[in-house]
């Protein structure tokens, strides 16, 4: 039973960043997710507040272990921030959030976080080129099945309720 269930769910995926290009999949843009740099109040008190993406001197940053060139703000982080200003690297999103919350440094985070994390402060408006898309991919053979259509409709309705500013 579990094997069959997994096979059925394997006919769709959520992808973040660049548009998927696999030929056997139908790709739908679910939502655009703007991002900006965030810091905690304790970080701002100690190091000051960045004014824009060029104002990096004297600031500490939280980064990912590897670059994800398909995610614009992660790519910026890896290309624009000198190694000596990276104070912590992580491979997962929850560790990045915890490090920013603890005041260790600044990190790029999607704006939807504003809805649930009042302890994180957006430093400025989202740079236009930092908006990434969330894509739903469904295998062409399963795209029109009732299960996939119901899930797609549910997902689109839920995502339309997110306040992204």
Language model regions located:
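Residues at the C-termini of beta-strands that transition into short coil/loop
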Residues: 16-17, 65, 124-127, 140
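Hydrophobic hinge/microswitch elements
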Residues: 80-122, 144, 152, 160
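Short beta-strand->loop
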Residues: 27-30, 110-111, 119-131
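Alpha-helix boundary recognition
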Residues: 31, 54-57, 100-101, 115, ...
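Acidic, Gly/Pro-rich loop/turn segments at junctions of secondary structure
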Residues: 1-89
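A late-sequence structural motif
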Residues: 126-165
């Amino acid at each position: 039973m579990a094997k069959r269930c997994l096979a059925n769910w394997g006919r769709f995926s959520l992808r973040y960043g660049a548009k998927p290009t696999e030929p056997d999949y139908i790709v739908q843009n679910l939502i655009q997710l703007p991002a900006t740099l965030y810091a905690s109040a304790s970080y701002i008190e100690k190091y000051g507040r960045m004014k824009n993406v060029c104002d990096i001197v004297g600031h500490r940053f939280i980064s990912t272990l590897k670059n994800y060139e398909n995610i614009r703000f992660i790519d910026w982080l890896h290309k624009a921030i000198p190694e000596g200003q990276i104070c912590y690297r992580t491979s997962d999103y929850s560790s990045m959030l915890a490090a920013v919350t603890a005041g260790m440094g600044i990190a790029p985070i999607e704006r939807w976080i504003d809805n649930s994390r009042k302890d994180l402060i957006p430093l400025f408006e989202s740079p236009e080129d930092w908006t990434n898309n969330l894509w739903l991919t469904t295998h062409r053979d399963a795209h029109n099945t009732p299960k996939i259509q119901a899930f797609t409709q549910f997902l689109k309705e839920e995502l339309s309720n997110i306040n992204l500013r």
